[in-house]
């Protein structure tokens, strides 16, 4: 009995040692050499693994940066921003051009007041599920479905649902422009746009492509595709296609002429300073009557 146990232990020990040697030889022969700079780049990244860079995660993005070096034009981490990319460039010993910061914008103004409900949805609270089942619980089949898929997708707590309007609201201070909410929205009402000068932006807060009368019936704030905004824009920043106006933020100079011209209020201007009306000048005091000459007594 004792001899059997000893032989069993010896055989297993030898077998384990042989297999370990074989595994070591195979690992050394087929190992893939990895650039040590990948680890260095990964250390300076935020570590959010949000996928906003277009890669699977921060590790994959670090590898992509190393492989793309010295040209980092296609590499950008929205969470780290320009400051983070400067750190990446410093590790790789290259230069990188600064990019315009962006923010998520909700292009729908179909509030509970503007877009009345025509039916009530009682299924699973998910925008994707709701969109797959039917066109929504209002007359507009293009607008926000209100289930908060974008809120759930945001890792930074930058989006919340407004209980009064029923629409998502973006916190610009927290938004990193990772694009997770854009991918999560089945109606494509969320868009990444340049923050603009002093965070001021002008955009069409509507995605309805129905004809004007149909769109207006479904929502009081819908774009009706009249084209008035495009006609008054001096910079050719506005186009109208499929009954819907769109403002190219790379051409827009923030003159706001389109905002004043829009008959439905579908164009929004945000973060502009409030211009206080000039106080009216006080009416001038009436002129004093001219003095009468004094007659001398004779």
Describe the function of each predicted region.
Residues 228, 238-240, 244-246:
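Strongly charged, low-complexity linkers/loops
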Residues 2-226, 231-232, 261, 265-268, ...:
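Ferredoxin-type iron-sulfur electron-transfer modules and their immediate structural context
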């Amino acid at each position: 009995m004792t001899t059997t146990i000893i032989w069993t232990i010896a055989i297993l020990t030898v077998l384990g040692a042989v297999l370990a040697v074989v595994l070591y030889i195979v690992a050394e022969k087929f190992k893939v050499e990895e650039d040590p700079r990948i680890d260095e780049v990964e250390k300076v990244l935020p570590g959010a693994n949000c996928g906003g860079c277009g890669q699977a995660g921060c590790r994959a993005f670090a590898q992509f940066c190393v492989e793309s070096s010295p040209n980092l034009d296609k590499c950008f981490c929205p969470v780290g921003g320009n400051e983070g990319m400067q750190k990446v460039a410093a590790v790789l010993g290259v230069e990188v051009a600064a990019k315009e910061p962006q923010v998520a914008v909700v292009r729908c103004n179909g509030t509970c007041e503007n877009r009345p409900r025509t039916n009530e949805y009682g299924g699973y609270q998910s925008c994707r599920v709701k969109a797959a089942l039917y066109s929504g619980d209002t007359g507009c089949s293009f607008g926000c479905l209100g289930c908060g898929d974008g809120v759930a997708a945001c890792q930074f707590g930058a989006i919340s649902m407004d209980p009064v309007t029923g629409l998502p609201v973006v916190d610009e201070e927290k938004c990193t422009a990772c694009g997770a909410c854009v991918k999560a929205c089945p109606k494509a009402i969320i868009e990444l746009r340049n923050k603009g000068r002093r965070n001021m932006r002008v955009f069409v807060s509507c995605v309805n492509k129905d004809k004007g009368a149909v769109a207006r019936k479904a929502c009081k704030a819908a774009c009706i595709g009249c084209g008035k905004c495009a006609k008054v824009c001096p910079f050719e920043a506005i186009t109208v296609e499929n009954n819907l106006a769109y403002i190219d933020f790379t051409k827009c100079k923030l003159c706001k002429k389109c905002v004043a011209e829009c008959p439905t209020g579908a164009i929004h201007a945000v973060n502009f300073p409030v211009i206080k009306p000039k106080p009216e000048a006080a009416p001038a005091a009436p002129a004093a009557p001219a003095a009468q000459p004094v007659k001398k007594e004779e």
